[in-house]
């Protein structure tokens, strides 16, 4: 059993010990599904950390977006500094999938931009899963997409040991077949070089170089080396060099795949010609023959993923192998905000197939392209051995699967109660709202107001602004970095009120918010359903004076259930506080300098700031990230910042300003260490 060393400045409190005991017992008893029904701010992540530590299982923590994944990864790295906590999200900075619009006869080619830093983290995750047992991978939904064949990936790895006799030419051929490229001038990730009796490799999973010093045919020493200074960082007895890409296809399998593609093409052309689809048949034949020539000559073609079924030797309709298949047999799945994440799992396959069907029907792709896909819902659950759903408002499906294995956690370690809930009539609601906002703002507290439509949110924002209220409006067209910036400005007191349609129902903590206002609470629908109301009310659950105002003229079933559940939790919390003599105290961290530095980063990334600005931003982030990881957004921003700094460094080196280039190089090194958790 792997040993997890949980490090925390506090011990489980409230109903955390009972929740931990219940979940650990369920895992040890082999329960397939459990649910942690934890109210906002009760320390669900700490409970999960204890569960992982006590069961000793490799764990996959699934979040529904990369911001929450970054937040969870940061928190778990704090709890497990000596264990492997990896971050696995989509490596695309930009992705436009291949598509065809029949109505306008428009073909859209696939275009994408891969973030090399995130690709490194993905390789780091799979490497840890092969080499360690104490591994926690925090992933987004991208983990259900194909990721090569684990057995082939492992088989293709090249192992070096001190004292081992090797044939250097054979090793170099192995590296090339594993998609490393030789570059004796500039070495980086995915490259290698040979200088005399020294072989240096930039492994796909690390920002450090691996140096092998040879004496004749014998490996004399192996060491990690700083890629810019050449300084030896530490010596090794042995090392595995894994392929530069997760998709590894041996020569014999490639030959078999080409034959299978030719056969499928022949069958498909016969079908299209019989159907009288001559244009589609000609289009498909031209594209596929060109792709086959490319595969035969260079082993690669544009859109090679569409032939994934043939290249991996899978049967038609069979499930692709993904990140889950890199885990050992005895692993644990933890799904955060399961009421959002589980529907995502179901939606991914259907959306992908709808787009592929159009491409196949119109002769752009062979039918086998449909098998380059994410996992189906049933395939995912067949691979998952034991699952814990985590949510303040679990969905009906999660609850039905867990049946009796539902563990509740409603008591906050801080003693803060769920907010009071008041229902007020809509007549005169705007003036009443204005009064409540001024009252809270005078105490330096923050307010969230949620409306049903964008137009209503805009009009309300304008009205509040005219009445001298410091207010901002959040809507769906705001990009993620600016969205985080607006949220943190709220925390920092740049303004007092945030108005929006679907405001932060899950995830980010806002301990400064004491008032949540829900307009048109009696309009039944997705945004005013029971779970949505509970999640929105929960945004005020971290403040001692938390209050939720629902403006409505009638009591809907959803409102009644949400209010009843909030009052039930509040009563449990109050009784516990009285019995244990607990006085509620403010929850959460204050927005700190690490957040401020992130805001500077996001602003500078949207304009081409000076080199000094970027160095200053990097210095602030390095200084504060060591002390405070806050909400995890800094982790999410690092790949983009590193790319900017590298671009600046190359420009300075080209201009012969080596002093500034060296300063930038040092900052990049420190930021990369922060990114991989070292």
Curated annotation (Swiss-Prot):
Q: Where is the UVR domain?
A: 639-674
Database matches in InterPro entries:
Helicase/UvrB_N, Helicase_ATP-bd, Helicase_C-like, P-loop_NTPase, UVR_dom, UVR_dom_sf, UvrB, UvrB_inter
The Swiss-Prot or TrEMBL record annotates one GO molecular function as:
DNA binding
Residue runs in coiled coils: none
Q: What residues does the Helicase C-terminal domain cover? A: 429-591
Print the keywords alphabetically. ATP-binding, Cytoplasm, DNA damage, DNA excision, DNA repair, Excision nuclease, Nucleotide-binding, SOS response
Please state every residue range assigned to the domain named Helicase ATP-binding.
25-412
Q: Which GO terms describe its biological process?
A: nucleotide-excision repair; SOS response
Q: How does it assemble?
A: Forms a heterotetramer with UvrA during the search for lesions. Interacts with UvrC in an incision complex.
Q: What does this protein do?
A: The UvrABC repair system catalyzes the recognition and processing of DNA lesions. A damage recognition complex composed of 2 UvrA and 2 UvrB subunits scans DNA for abnormalities. Upon binding of the UvrA(2)B(2) complex to a putative damaged site, the DNA wraps around one UvrB monomer. DNA wrap is dependent on ATP binding by UvrB and probably causes local melting of the DNA helix, facilitating insertion of UvrB beta-hairpin between the DNA strands. Then UvrB probes one DNA strand for the presence of a lesion.
Give the protein's recorded name.
UvrABC system protein B
The source organism is Prochlorococcus marinus (strain NATL2A)
Q: Which gene encodes it?
A: uvrB
């Amino acid at each position: 059993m792997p040993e997890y060393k949980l490090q925390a400045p506090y011990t489980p409190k409230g109903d955390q010990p009972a929740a931990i005991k219940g979940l650990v017992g369920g895992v040890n008893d082999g329960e397939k599904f459990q649910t942690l029904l934890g109210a906002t701010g009760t320390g669900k992540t700490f409970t999960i950390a204890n569960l992982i530590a006590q069961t000793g299982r490799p764990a996959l923590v699934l979040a529904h977006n990369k911001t929450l994944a970054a937040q969870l990864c940061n928190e778990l790295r704090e709890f497990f500094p000596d264990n492997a906590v990896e971050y696995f999200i989509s490596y695309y900075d930009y992705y436009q999938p291949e598509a065809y619009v029949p109505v306008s006869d428009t073909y859209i080619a696939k275009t994408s931009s891969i973030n090399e830093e995130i690709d490194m983290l993905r390789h780091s995750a799979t490497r840890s899963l092969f080499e360690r047992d104490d591994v926690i991978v925090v992933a987004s939904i991208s983990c259900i997409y194909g990721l090569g064949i684990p057995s082939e990936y492992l088989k293709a790895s090249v192992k070096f040991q001190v004292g081992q006799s090797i044939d250097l030419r054979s090793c170099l051929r192995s590296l090339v077949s594993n998609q490393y490229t030789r570059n004796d001038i500039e070495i980086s990730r995915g490259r290698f070089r040979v200088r005399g009796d020294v072989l240096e490799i930039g492994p796909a999973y690390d920002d450090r170089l691996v140096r092998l010093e040879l004496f004749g045919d014998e490996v004399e020493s192996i060491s990690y080396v700083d890629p810019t200074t050449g300084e030896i960082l530490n010596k090794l007895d042995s090392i595995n060099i894994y392929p530069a890409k997760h998709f590894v296809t041996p020569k014999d399998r490639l030959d078999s795949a080409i034959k299978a593609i030719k056969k499928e093409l022949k069958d498909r052309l016969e079908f299209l010609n019989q159907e009288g689809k001559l244009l589609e048949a000609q289009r498909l034949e031209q594209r596929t023959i060109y792709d086959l020539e490319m595969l035969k000559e260079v082993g690669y073609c544009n859109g090679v993923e569409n032939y994934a079924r043939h290249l991996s030797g899978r049967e038609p309709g069979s499930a692709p192998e993904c990140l889950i298949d890199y885990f050992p047999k005895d692993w644990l799945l933890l799904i955060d905000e399961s009421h959002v994440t589980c529907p995502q799992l179901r939606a991914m396959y259907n959306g992908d197939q709808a787009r592929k069907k159009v491409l196949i029907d119109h002769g752009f792709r062979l039918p086998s392209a449909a098998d380059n896909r994410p996992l189906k819902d049933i395939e995912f659950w067949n691979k998952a051995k034991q699952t814990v759903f985590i949510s303040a408002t679990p969905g009906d499906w999660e609850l039905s699967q867990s049946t009796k294995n539902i563990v509740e956690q409603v008591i906050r370690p801080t003693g803060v109660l769920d907010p009071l809930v008041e229902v007020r009539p809509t007549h005169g609601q705007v003036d009443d709202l204005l009064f409540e906002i001024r009252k809270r703002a005078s105490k330096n507290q923050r307010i969230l107001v949620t409306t049903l439509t964008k137009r209503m949110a805009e009009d309300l924002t304008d009205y509040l602004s005219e009445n001298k209220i410091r207010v901002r409006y959040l809507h769906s067209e705001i990009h993620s970095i600016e969205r985080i910036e607006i949220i943190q400005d709220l925390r920092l007191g740049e303004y007092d009120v945030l108005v929006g349609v679907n405001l932060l129902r899950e995830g980010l903590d806002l301990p400064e918010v004491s008032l949540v206002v829900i307009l048109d609470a009696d309009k039944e629908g997705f945004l005013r359903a029971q779970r949505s109301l509970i999640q929105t009310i929960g945004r005020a659950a971290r403040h001692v004076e938390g209050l939720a105002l629902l403006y409505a003229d009638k009591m809907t079933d959803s409102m009644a259930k949400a209010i009843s559940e909030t009052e039930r939790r509040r009563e449990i919390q109050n009784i516990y506080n009285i019995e244990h003599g607990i006085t509620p105290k403010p929850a959460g961290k204050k927005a700190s300098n690490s957040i401020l530095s992130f805001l500077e980063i996001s602003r500078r990334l949207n304009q081409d700031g000076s080199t000094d600005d970027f160095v200053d931003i990097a210095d602030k982030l390095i200084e504060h990230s060591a002390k405070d990881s806050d909400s995890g957004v800094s982790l999410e921003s690092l790949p983009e910042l590193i790319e900017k700094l590298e671009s600046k460094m190359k420009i300075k080196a080209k201009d012969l300003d080596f002093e500034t280039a060296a300063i930038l190089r040092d900052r990049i090194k420190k930021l990369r260490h922060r990114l991989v958790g070292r």
